[in-house]
Amino acid sequence: NYMVITGLLQQGYRKLAYEIARNHYDNVLKVYKNTGTFWEYYAPEHEEPGFMARPNFVGWGGLAPISGLIEQIFGIRSNVYEKKLTVDVNLTEAYGIDRYPFGLDGLVGIKVKARSSATQEPQVEITSDVPLELTVLWGDKQKTANVKPGTQTV
């Protein structure tokens, strides 16, 4: 799933990538709630561990609850070499992440405020100790800002 989702994002299919990631994440969460643990891998078409998967094992199966949550569901993706950070906002609920590593020296805090609808322009509060370019995406719209060290709302 991770490889397919990444390929879809690279080809501009953000909505489909989000839907697949969200479905996979939700299924992993259901399995966790039912069994109390994470598994080595998961069944591709059912809400259950994969055939002969080991419990209490976070290998490739850890991509959904960690990377999938941050990169696809929260939409936080970085390109440190170009000093760019993207927040692709799909949720209407408030969410955020503190101490997101940005390269060797940077830490970034991101807080996305709640919205009344998916079409409403998101407000993103960003705290960074390094300069970067922030792009906020929602639907077919986007806004970009140059972020200086400190806190600002975009």
Say what each PLM segment does.
Residues R99-V154:
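C-terminal beta-sandwich/jelly-roll accessory domains of carbohydrate-active enzymes
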Residues N1-G103, G109, K113-S117:
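C-terminal capping/lid segments that line or modulate ligand- or cofactor-binding pockets
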